[in-house]
UniProtKB/Swiss-Prot annotation:
Subunit organization: Homodimer; disulfide-linked.
General function of this protein: Receptor activated by multiple ligands, including osteocalcin (BGLAP), basic amino acids, and various cations. Activated by amino acids with a preference for basic amino acids such as L-Lys, L-Arg and L-ornithine but also by small and polar amino acids. The L-alpha amino acids respond is augmented by divalent cations Ca(2+) and Mg(2+). Seems to act through a G(q)/G(11) and G(i)-coupled pathway.
Residue ranges, Extracellular side: 19-594, 653-669, 726-748, 804-810
Classification of source organism: Eukaryota, Metazoa, Chordata, Craniata, Vertebrata
Membrane-related topology note: Multi-pass membrane protein
Record topological domains on the Cytoplasmic side: 616-631, 691-704, 770-782, 832-926
Name under which the protein is recorded: G-protein coupled receptor family C group 6 member A
Gene3D superfamilies: 3.40.50.2300, GPCR, family 3, nine cysteines domain
GO cellular component: cell surface; plasma membrane
Bilayer-spanning residue ranges: 595-615, 632-652, 670-690, 705-725, 749-769, 783-803, 811-831
UniProt-annotated glycosylation sites, renumbered to this chain: 121, 259, 332, 378, 452, 555, 567, 590, 733
One Pfam short name: NCD3G
Record localization: Cell membrane
Keyword line: Cell membrane, Disulfide bond, G-protein coupled receptor, Glycoprotein, Membrane, Receptor, Signal, Transducer, Transmembrane, Transmembrane helix
Amino acid sequence: MAFLIILITCFVIILATSQPCQTPDDFVAATSPGHIIIGGLFAIHEKMLSSEDSPRRPQIQECVGFEISVFLQTLAMIHSIEMINNSTLLPGVKLGYEIYDTCTEVTVAMAATLRFLSKFNCSRETVEFKCDYSSYMPRVKAVIGSGYSEITMAVSRMLNLQLMPQVGYESTAEILSDKIRFPSFLRTVPSDFHQIKAMAHLIQKSGWNWIGIITTDDDYGRLALNTFIIQAEANNVCIAFKEVLPAFLSDNTIEVRINRTLKKIILEAQVNVIVVFLRQFHVFDLFNKAIEMNINKMWIASDNWSTATKITTIPNVKKIGKVVGFAFRRGNISSFHSFLQNLHLLPSDSHKLLHEYAMHLSACAYVKDTDLSQCIFNHSQRTLAYKANKAIERNFVMRNDFLWDYAEPGLIHSIQLAVFALGYAIRDLCQARDCQNPNAFQPWELLGVLKNVTFTDGWNSFHFDAHGDLNTGYDVVLWKEINGHMTVTKMAEYDLQNDVFIIPDQETKNEFRNLKQIQSKCSKECSPGQMKKTTRSQHICCYECQNCPENHYTNQTDMPHCLLCNNKTHWAPVRSTMCFEKEVEYLNWNDSLAILLLILSLLGIIFVLVVGIIFTRNLNTPVVKSSGGLRVCYVILLCHFLNFASTSFFIGEPQDFTCKTRQTMFGVSFTLCISCILTKSLKILLAFSFDPKLQKFLKCLYRPILIIFTCTGIQVVICTLWLIFAAPTVEVNVSLPRVIILECEEGSILAFGTMLGYIAILAFICFIFAFKGKYENYNEAKFITFGMLIYFIAWITFIPIYATTFGKYVPAVEIIVILISNYGILYCTFIPKCYVIICKQEINTKSAFLKMIYSYSSHSVSSIALSPASLDSMSGNVTMTNPSSSGKSATWQKSKDLQAQAFAHICRENATSVSKTLPRKRMSSI
């Protein structure tokens, strides 16, 4: 019996193969009468059966390769129309339909379109040529379909002639949003632009940048490829290879092209992520071959095949790797499930598809559900109505769950929305018309209403945008093996408006994170602290990793360039992942060098106080009086005290006050000190000047108080102008790489140099006067000269050191110079006198000083007599003779008188003198 059934089935198939399309009605897949007819285009069969490479006669060939999933789409349209007819949406108006099989061929779809455009209620079924189709009444009012963009474009160009509404449910090519080219086309799915943008976002988010892409050789595939290239570049993703497969299975080269594509995938070992824009039958063949070649990759699925049960049920499909895809947003299609349960109730005479399906079920009656789809595909031919209704019912009852398993929820919902959109538009159009009359309106009128209609699926409201698209978004799906079967699970949603993935729960987040474990990169990932250095390759994704230089950082992987730290406040070492705050530095109080300098300054202050006490207690002694008196000594000691104290303003955190105070305090006090010493040098020069004219001039010049006030006043003016016009301020020095130096900016180098230069001029004058007054056995001038030399040596050394020193120790250099010059002058001015006061009290008496003066006078006169000399200060040259000779010249006598006058002047002025009677070793220190 079973053998007989199989024999009869084979006979029917052979008979059907030999029966081409004889009449237009044979061409219709399903039909139902109504007041308003809606056309439908579905690729129910995968290809046309032709014995020739190219047709020789213009006839429609037989179609083979029955597709269960598209058969279900056809049923979804029928079900949606029946839902409207059974509702109150169009009271008294029945929607009918004519559904045609495109066989996945443009030519077949265009043939069906010609029948749609044929004149209504005309027996000849002709398409009339007119200059104006405004009043032309075609066979149908609108068309739903086709599924593939390539076919939809061709059909739409024909429908544009009459502006007949065409609502796509699966055609996603971006070009279809162009209302200039396709003014009558609308669709209930988003444009591919959004899908491709979401894919590029997913790839970038997962850390992949080296991928492959496979498309079809048609308008849809080429447009998708071009758009993806643009989005990939925007997301820094590189395409390692691009493979293009023939668009139709009838192409004899498809198997060769698939093999070449798989070999390319094997060669590109670093490419582990492949984007696939193919039709279901392409993917079916591709994956079967990939399983044979043991290829395991991550596949990014487009909405064409991401939820296709035909592919998920391929044996050992798990061996291909992981699949993440994008599917149309799901809706409530529970009523469609009930419709499938009662599929046998449809009238069989007008649904040839049901007869063909019944035939395939009979041929595959003993095949398991898992293999049933492939069995039907292999045995599919154009069906003849030879089965009884009772047999059909029995088969449907046996396999109704099988159909539901192959339903793609997103596509079913899109078809429902397409029918509902037309239904609501017809309702709005028929409110003032009698739509039971087929001539109530023209297709172009329906198009105008359809563009602005708001419709619902029972749960949500929808409307078309300005491009005729329905931006419902996408579901992101992941293929997972559950109980040994590959199952399509929803992983996330993609929000078109905000370009974000909406992840519902933590488990899904973990699945997203797991995608990052798959590596698909041309180059190894650059770690934080490194940047990408592009190689000679044409792809920016192929690069080398280079360490970030100093003061640069990267805190993420694969950054294209290193970020610059703020050089003013931060720094970074080589290969740094972050910037570090610069340490603020200045000559701090706890710095070892600062402590040492402070100790030296404090010792200097103590020494000044000790000297002041010694001089105060020995106020009336000749040594103190010969130093110019207590007032002059106190002024000099006060200046030294201020100089030592001024060093404290060079230490610690700089402030505007300390910056202004330290230089002016030192400059004025040191100038006052030098001015006082200058008057002493001038007095010594006056005391030992024997030229009457010079002596007279020096007497006129010698005005101690005026000299001190004038010299100091000039310095005060210099410092005042300095503070007014260019005062020293705190400066944040950021030129060092790792530290910030807080320092005092002198404001004006010219003013600073003028202040120091003026002190140097006074010191030089003082040095000249002291050097000129440096007489034998009179050590005051010698010590002043030595003190000035110390000052000059210290400050001459200071200039190059100060100019080349950088950092927080610049103030320390100036402190050291101040201490050296201050100690030098203080030592030379007061140490010899303190030595006499403390250690040689026997010569610190008036009688001892007078004795030394007379002794020096006698010695000086003897020296003049014994040593021939020319006295240029006299009116003529006089030769000195021995004073013991019997005759003393007048000239010699005159010199003696002048010498006596000089020492008398010294006594009157309380000038110091060192006795000749002291031993040489003692005198040298006084």
